Regions:
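Short carbohydrate-recognition loop motifs
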Residues: 48-66
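Localized edge beta-strand/strand-to-loop motifs within extracellular or lumenal beta-rich domains
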Residues: 146-160
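Beta-strand-rich interaction surfaces with strong enrichment in secreted/lumenal proteins
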Residues: 70-76, 136-142, 191-192
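Flexible glycan-contacting loops in extracellular carbohydrate-active proteins
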Residues: 171-201
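Short, aromatic/His-centered strand-loop micro-motif at the edge of beta-sheets
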Residues: 127-149
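Secretory/extracellular carbohydrate-interaction modules
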Residues: 63-126
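Extracellular beta-strand elements of beta-rich domains used
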Residues: 86, 205-207
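Extracellular carbohydrate-recognition regions
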Residues: 21-42
Length: 210
């Protein structure tokens, strides 16, 4: 039997450990809350990067331009079982534009959109093979000056990507080596967007737990 004083302490301890706020499930990364968490990635000869009215504008670099979100860890965003949604537009150029680098557990990978001449889609890198060489390689046509909606799902055993509502990547990552292609893309970790000799815009970046 628990005495009155002990019962009170037990109830207080239970309240402190079980009655906190529920875990956060959604982050709007281009909202005012995270305005100070974005910066240019600092790539060699990159174009101008601006953040205004909930949108990222990336001017063409020589060859690459990047935007980096540095608050992934401090904001306690997930590294698995989460989804990323955003819209990307290629304004000028004919290479990748809405390319996003993101965490997967203890690693990072990059979703290439419109690379290798304008149409290639895929994940870099799986088992040291980049998006043009592994099983995620695909092709899609992207018209300039149009918004293209993108959804990425990071699950325990697989990665899935939809562009314009169409499933374009569905790959198992169980037992696979996940990594980034060597070079300036590493400056976009833990999360960021990159273009290659291309002017682009990105908006509506939302991360949600699955």
């Amino acid at each position: 039997m628990i005495g009155g004083g002990s019962a009170l302490w037990f109830c207080l301890l239970f309240a402190l450990t079980h009655c906190g706020p529920p875990p956060r499930t959604e982050w709007k990364l281009l909202s005012d809350e995270f305005e100070s968490s974005w910066q240019a990635a600092g790539m060699a000869e990159e174009g101008r990067v601006t953040f205004k009215d909930g949108e990222i504008s990336l001017d063409a670099g020589e060859p690459m331009t990047g935007a980096r979100f540095e608050a992934w860890q401090s904001a306690r965003l997930p590294r698995s079982r989460y989804a990323i949604e955003y819209e990307a537009m290629r304004v000028e150029g004919n290479d990748f534009f809405g390319t996003v680098t993101f965490p997967v557990n203890d690693s990072h990978v990059t979703l290439v959109i419109g690379g290798w001449g304008g149409t290639l889609v895929g994940i870099s890198s799986l088992d040291d093979l980049d998006a043009s060489e592994n099983t995620t390689t695909g092709n899609a046509f992207f018209k300039n000056n149009e918004w293209h909606p993108v959804r990425v799902e990071v699950r325990d055993d697989d990665l899935r990507v939809w562009i314009g509502g169409k499933l374009v990547v569905n790959v198992s990552i169980k037992g696979r080596k996940l990594s980034l292609r060597a070079g300036d893309i590493e400056k976009c970790t833990p999360f960021g967007f990159t273009t290659y000799a291309t002017q682009a815009r990105v908006r509506g970046v939302v991360v949600r737990r699955l």
